[in-house]
Amino acid sequence: DILEPYAEKSYKRHLEKYISLGLPQEKAEEVAWKDLEKEMEQGFQGWEYKFNSVSSSRGDYPFITVTAGTNTSKYGKLATIKMLQVRQEGQGKEGHKKPVLFPKLVFLYDENLHGPGKPLEDVFEAGIECSRKTMYPDWLSLTGKGYVASMHKQYGKIISPMGCRAFLSPWYERGGMTPADEKDT
């Protein structure tokens, strides 16, 4: 969701460039989309490289978690699919690439959105393929049982993990640690 508005702006910038160069609308849209795909791929490659090669003065690497998988816009879907494809490709020299650890990827599964015939079938398939080849991403169910699912069902909010398994306690907009009323999310 965070990358969606930036992806849309980037696409529009590419589209305007190709239209101003005289390309027909359909061709301009096709080439602009390919440019956006390449930008997304390079952006996620850059993330992975930096998060796994730049350590602190103590030698620590940033432990970053990225949750994805629920955005139904074409830009949100593209971002999630490209992120998964980059992870699947790995980092390193050709022929010796390995999947990296950071950022930790978490796929948010919703039985109403994912699977055959559902709005995010392509995103779900990209997640399955990435898992098949790399053991990543981790999967959290928004419609199953457990803390994440219960918070999502009750408040419509997604709780992302910090690092491996730590989740922040809910913070309610008006009540803080405890909800002010049934509508406080």
Regions found by a protein language model. Name each.
Residues 1-185:
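Conserved catalytic cores of very large enzyme subunits
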